[in-house]
Curated annotation (Swiss-Prot):
It comes from Buchnera aphidicola subsp. Schizaphis graminum (strain Sg). Belongs to the IlvD/Edd family. It comes from the Bacteria. [2Fe-2S] cluster binds at residues 122, 195. The active site is at residue 517. This is Dihydroxy-acid dehydratase.
Length: 617
């Protein structure tokens, strides 16, 4: 009989009480011989990306039981960043990542679970589950709830695709009528699923697919499509298979740390750069690498950004394509296929199918596969009806988008840009680096300089933008919004979208030690490290200072003399306990957020907790 981890609680005379409790959950004598597989669900009625996951949990549970496992489901919390954004609720979003990861560890280890299937979707939940899987290192399979269909509105001569960001942009435009804004509001988010652009949720689900912890198609197959149900069933069968393979055959290749190794992280980051994904993914990959003891740092991302082309353009970088269009073009596997044709990937990395990347692409890249089922899956398209029911439609595109010259996904030779969609900048203003999403920036803005307008909070900056205090050429500096200084590293979607609504998004820059929503576009530079609260130079910027940004040379520079900089450091340190803290900011910080801030490191470390501040156990 195999020695499952769960035997700790299901075998032996001294575990009679535990077995009695297990029986009260429905387990039988036969079940005590099988692996206990956790369904780590994140169903929530607060989040459209999670509203349908209760039904998903039931499908997975039934399939696990059918194939010889004992399914046990529990839920994590889930915060909707879009609803939490623009007010104090956003302070809680990033800290929830650590809370979710910890809660998974608690449940899994307390009950000696053998393996887990992670049912996630939105911004902080997928990263948290990824971190937990690497921390626990038990067989794990990921399956997301799937992307939302893009919204649609009819104009005079055509139908236009829209998404959540359009609703925010138009909501900040005083020239738009209430009726028009209502029309956008009613159309922007038409179905269940993660928001339809390549925002943080979809970016992370695509990266998990590239890493190899989910099945092909997971990142782009729509939540509403009937094929998504098949994916859930396949994922359930897969977790049973790899669980038994590990415990019965001692196959350690199926463990998360062996699948998600440095080469896999590099492949995932290459995908991210190639498709211009959310800058938040960098934060989460760095945090996950720490959990898995993977030597993957900001410098690795910087090196990749110098050689990976931008070959896939998706909203918010364009209004032509959404994630449903990426799927039609072949999804994650097609993007990886194009990179592989240019020898930009490590082909020997393995996944939960037990295949290396080379074999996986041969089967799942639409430009090379002969598998009819794979081709059929990538034909899955949007139903076009408002619904929160998953698997409720079976629409298929008439043909796939295989256009490597002018299509959604292009070849290296026909790339949107030879420079990738994400870049790392360094300089005296960001000694440890900062991140910019170059996918949405016109090349003529790659070199930009202007006078600083400094704000101690996002709210203060928003007020300045809406009251007309920002003019073309300004560099807006929002500081003390980092992991520690916020605390919680708020997303700056509202400042950037309000700039867009008044047509200043291409004429101004915005830099911050906070972060940006996956929906952000324009010359927006975030994750400045060290952050202001950790004695970063951004804390010393003054109104009118010249700030120079050079994306070509990957630099960001506060243009003052070394002497002046040293004088400012001395002046700041002289403030004592008030040094490196925001002036006159009124913000209610709860005990929970203060506890998070106490341990939080800057963004270049993934905003993880500082081990040096923990007790030495």
């Amino acid at each position: 009989m195999p020695k499952y981890r769960s035997f700790t609680t299901t075998h032996g005379r001294n575990m009679s009480g535990a077995r009695s409790l297990w029986r009260a959950t429905g387990m039988t004598d036969e079940d005590f011989k099988k692996p206990i597989i956790a369904i780590v669900n994140s169903f929530s009625q607060f989040v459209p990306g999670h509203i349908h996951l209760q039904e998903v949990g039931k499908i997975i549970s039934k399939e696990i039981k059918k194939y010889g496992g004992v399914p046990k489901e529990f839920n994590t919390i889930a915060i909707d960043d879009g609803i939490a954004m623009g007010h104090s609720g956003m302070l809680y979003s990033l800290p929830s990542r650590e809370l979710i990861a910890d809660s998974i560890e608690y449940v899994i280890n307390a009950h000696c679970v053998d393996s887990m299937i992670c049912v996630s979707n939105c911004d902080k939940i997928t990263p948290a589950m990824f971190m937990a899987s690497l921390r626990l290192n038990i067989p794990s399979v990921f399956v997301s709830g799937g992307p939302m269909e893009a919204g649609k509105i009819k104009t005079k001569d055509k139908t236009k695709k829209i998404d959540l960001v359009d609703a925010i942009i138009h909501g900040g435009d005083s020239n738009k009528s209430d009726d028009f804004i209502r029309e956008i509001e009613l159309s922007a988010c038409p179905t269940c699923g993660s928001c339809s652009g390549m925002f943080t949720a979809n970016s992370m689900n695509c990266l998990i697919e590239a890493i190899g912890l989910s099945l092909p198609g997971n990142g782009t197959l729509l939540a509403t499509h009937i094929d998504r149900k098949k994916l859930f069933k396949k994922s359930a069968r897969n977790i049973v298979k790899i669980t038994k393979d590990y415990y019965l055959n001692n196959n350690k290749n199926v463990l998360p740390r062996n699948i998600a190794n440095k080469e896999s992280f590099e492949n995932a980051m290459a995908l991210d750069i190639a498709m211009g994904g959310s800058t938040n993914t960098i934060l989460h990959l760095l945090a996950a690498a720490y959990e898995g003891k993977v030597d993957f740092k900001m410098s690795d991302i910087n090196n990749l950004s110098k050689k990976i082309p931008h070959i896939c353009k998706v909203a918010p970088s364009t209004n032509l394509y959404h994630v449903e269009d990426v799927h039609r073009a072949g999804g994650v596997m097609r993007i990886l296929g194009e990179l592989n044709r240019s020898n930009l990937l490590n082909k020997k990395t393995e996944n939960i199918l037990g295949l290396n990347l080379e074999k996986t692409l041969k089967k799942y890249d639409i430009l090379s596969t002969k598998n009819k089922n794979v081709i059929k899956m990538f034909h899955a398209g949007p139903g076009g009806n408002r619904t929160i029911k998953p698997f409720s439609q079976n629409y298929r595109w008439n043909k796939l988008d295989k256009d490597r010259v002018n299509g959604c996904i292009r070849s290296h030779e026909n790339a949107y840009s030879k420079n990738g969609g994400l870049s790392v900048l360094y300089g005296n203003l960001a000694k440890n680096g900062c991140i910019i999403k170059t996918a949405s920036i016109d090349k003529k803005h790659y070199i930009f300089s202007g006078p600083a307008k400094v704000y101690e909070s996002q709210e203060e900056a928003v007020s300045a933008i809406l009251s007309g205090k920002i003019i073309a050429g300004d560099v807006i500096v929002i500081r003390y919004e980092g992991p520690k200084g916020g605390p919680g590293m708020q997303e700056m979607l509202y400042p950037t979208t309000y700039l867009k609504s008044i047509n200043l998004d291409k004429q101004c820059a915005l830099i911050t030690d906070g972060r940006f929503s996956g929906g952000t576009s324009g010359l927006s530079i975030g994750h400045i490290s060290p952050e202001a609260a950790n004695k970063g130079i951004i804390a010393l910027v003054e109104n009118g200072d010249d700030i120079q940004i050079n994306i070509v040379n990957k630099t960001i520079h506060l243009n003052i003399t070394e002497k002046e900089l040293n004088l400012r450091i001395i002046k700041e340190n002289a403030k004592g306990l008030k040094a490196y803290k925001p002036l006159n900011r009124k913000r209610n910080i709860s005990f929970a957020l203060r506890a998070y801030a106490h341990f939080a490191l800057s963004a270049d470390k993934g905003a993880i907790r500082n081990k040096k501040k923990l007790f030495n156990f």
